[in-house]
Amino acid sequence: MSRSVNPARGEASVAGIMLRPSFAALVAAEEELGPLFALVERAAAGQLKLSEMVALFWHCRFDVGADVSRDAFSDSVTASGLVAATPALKTLLGQILGGR
C-alpha cells in the first residue's frame, strides 16, 4: 500500500491493500452480492459469508497493481484472519450505511 488510508473518506486497509468504498466500487459489489442493505443485515445477524466479505473488499480495493489476482487477494485476506479483517469490514459497512 503506497498511501495511508483516509478515514474521512471511508477508507480502510486489509492485508496491506487500501480499500476505498467509491460509488463505482459499491455498485460493482452490489452487482455481485445483491442489495447492499441486505449485505449489512446479514453481517449484523452474523450470517455474512467469508466469500461475501472478500468480494466486498475486492471491489473496494484501490491503487493495486494489475499483478494482484482475485485469488491471491482472497488468500491474503484469509491468511490475515477474521480479526484483522473485521475493522475494515466495520468501516466499509459503516460507509454503506452512513455515506459521506
Enumerate the language-model features and the residues they cover:
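Charged interaction scaffolds used for protein-protein
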Residues: 1-11, 31-51, 62-100
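Glycine-centered positions within short beta-strands or beta-hairpins
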Residues: 14-19
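Residue-level signal for threonine
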Residues: 22
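A short local loop/turn or secondary-structure capping micro-motif enriched for an aromatic residue
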Residues: 26-29
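A residue-level signal for conserved active-site and pocket-lining positions in enzyme catalytic cores
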Residues: 57
